[in-house]
Design a protein with these regions (language model features):
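Hydrophobic transmembrane alpha-helices of multi-pass small-molecule transporters
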Residues: 71-74, 118, 186-191, 216-220, ...
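Short alpha-helical transmembrane segments in multi-pass integral membrane proteins
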Residues: 1-29, 87-154, 196-252, 308-373, ...
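Small-residue-rich hydrophobic transmembrane alpha-helices
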Residues: 59-119, 156-175, 269, 282-346, ...
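Short runs within selected transmembrane alpha-helices of multi-pass transporters and secretion channels
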Residues: 80, 148-167, 175-183, 204-219, ...
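Transmembrane helical elements of multi-pass membrane transporters/channels
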Residues: 27-46, 148, 159, 182, ...
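N-terminal transmembrane alpha-helices
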Residues: 16-53, 67-82, 86, 111-118, ...
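Helix-terminus/linker motif at the lipid-water interface of multi-pass membrane proteins
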Residues: 37, 41-60, 129-136, 192-199, ...
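Small-residue hotspots at the loop-to-helix junctions and early N-terminal turns
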Residues: 54-67, 143-146, 205, 277-292, ...
Length: 466
């Protein structure tokens, strides 16, 4: 087993417990941001290929399955963030043997979850589509797409867990390289399967599955070859119960929060579906651009999680909090920079996905009404990520469920039944939810101590922080 000889950056991991805070946050966030942009771009290529070369029904089908896919991926990402928090705290505390145990426990769990997700996804596809009021003309293609996607979802899960492990020790660069390879391959296969072989929506699904499998393979090869504490040694693959308990403590609330928040979007989608196919098309385009606008703050939030995790591992709460303040300031500045061109060029951005005038009108309207409120999102994203890094994901789960699920559903119900069944009053449920969530998260963050939820100290082992 390889021990970390010194606390300074190795050839790939980065120790965030010393050195320039802003520099660490930005250096860590940039590959994340670039990687996420690539991921969104290749999702957009999928949508663009379908919208321009297959059919309008197929375009709506890919949009319709979005919330279902996001719900399951969100669930797994929440769980893998739990793994990342455990590893980053032990890495910060220089507890190499615990890092090793966490890596191998996480990978065994991932294999088990791959089997569960594949079975559930393939088995429940028709039921999920029916629950979402999927129109009959879109149903066969939506069903075909989801069945292939879930059949090959293991690649996505393994890649996400492997890259989460690397990020926990400060290496956000290599996961980015693998994403680029995956995105380029996905685009090439899209064009080959759809344009050359005429495979339609199924071709798009196969392209995604193959590209994700390649990124999973690359991340496993790196874990097998790395000289760091996160090295994968196949004979050591087993579940270590003390570490498993900690992963569950952080990961399960995060997974529930992400899955249920995404599930609440399924309800929003069914309200949108009631406005007809043009509005569905506009909403599909809006959600694609929305995901790009959220990326700067999400990348900085992930930086904050790793930064807080490593610094609390060392027992340095003031430095951890200083990092959170910097991350929030950078996230807000970046969000404003992204917002300006979106407000200016909303119709052109919508038309990139679908040139039908009615669809463009809906998409541009949605973008211009909702995007000025994204700055509110920075607060809940960064503070919740910081609390998660401290091992406290239960509180953020409760706050987000109350804001994004309870509050938003009550808002949608009252608005649609008693006030106005028009599009804009309904979709203002998004900014209203962000406002409630940000206020509650900020109040909680100010009143809570990071060290009380730290994982390293509770671990019961004598060999604690130096």
């Amino acid at each position: 087993m390889h021990h970390i000889q010194h606390p300074h950056p190795t050839h790939s991991g980065v120790d965030m417990t010393e050195g320039n805070i802003t520099g660490h946050l930005i250096r860590f966030a940039l590959p994340l941001l670039a990687g996420n942009i690539f991921q969104q771009l290749y999702n957009m290529v999928d949508t663009w290929v379908v919208g321009n070369f297959v059919s309008n029904e197929a375009f709506s089908a890919v949009g319709t399955v979005g919330p279902i896919v996001n719900m399951l991926i969100g669930c797994f990402l929440g769980f893998s963030s739990g793994v990342g928090v455990v590893i980053s705290q032990y890495y910060g505390a220089r507890r190499t043997e615990r890092v090793h145990d966490a890596v191998h426990t996480a990978l065994v769990l991932t294999v088990i979850l791959c089997a569960v997700f594949t079975a559930l996804g393939v088995g429940f596809t028709p039921l999920m589509l029916r629950l979402m009021n999927t129109p009959a003309e879109v149903f066969p293609e939506s069903s075909a797409y989801l069945t292939i996607y879930f059949g090959g979802i293991s690649g996505l899960l393994i890649y996400n867990m492997g890259s989460g492990i690397l990020r926990a020790v400060g290496d956000s660069r290599r996961p980015f390289y693998f994403l680029v390879v995956s995105a380029v391959l996905n685009t090439a296969l899209d064009l080959l399967f759809v344009l050359r072989f005429g495979m339609g929506v199924e071709g798009v699904a196969w392209a995604t599955v193959i590209a994700q499998a390649v990124s999973a393979l690359l991340v496993i090869v790196v874990l097998l070859r790395t000289q760091q504490a996160v090295r994968l040694i196949p004979r050591d693959l087993r579940i270590h119960l003390p570490v498993l308990r900690q992963i569950i403590r952080v990961g399960v609330p995060s997974a529930l929060q992400m899955a249920i928040t995404a599930f609440s979007n399924v309800f929003v989608q069914s309200y949108i579906n009631s406005f007809g196919a043009d509005c569905m098309g506009g909403w599909t385009a809006y959600t694609k651009i929305d995901q790009l606008m959220l990326l700067p703050m999400q990348s900085l939030a992930l930086s904050a999680t790793t930064f807080v995790g490593q610094n609390l591992g060392r027992g340095n709460e003031p430095r951890a909090r200083q990092g959170v303040r910097r991350a929030l300031a950078i996230a807000m500045a970046a969000t404003v920079l992204v917002m300006i061109p979106v407000l200016a060029f909303a119709p052109q951005m919508t038309a990139f996905f679908n040139r039908k005038p009615e669809v463009v009108a809906y998409g541009a309207l949605l973008l211009r009404c909702i995007s000025p409120f994204y700055v509110l999102c920075c607060f809940n994203q960064v503070y919740a990520a910081a609390l998660r890094g401290a091992g406290n994901s239960k509180a953020t789960m409760i706050i987000m469920l109350c804001s994004f699920v309870l509050f938003r559903q009550v808002y949608l119900f009252i608005m649609s039944h008693y006030i106005s069944h028009e599009l804009i009053p309904l979709v203002m449920g998004y900014p209203a939810g962000w406002l409630v969530c940000s206020a509650a998260t900020l109040i909680y963050y100010r009143r809570t101590s990071f060290l009380s939820t730290r994982l390293v100290a509770e671990d019961g082992s004598k060999e604690d922080i130096q």
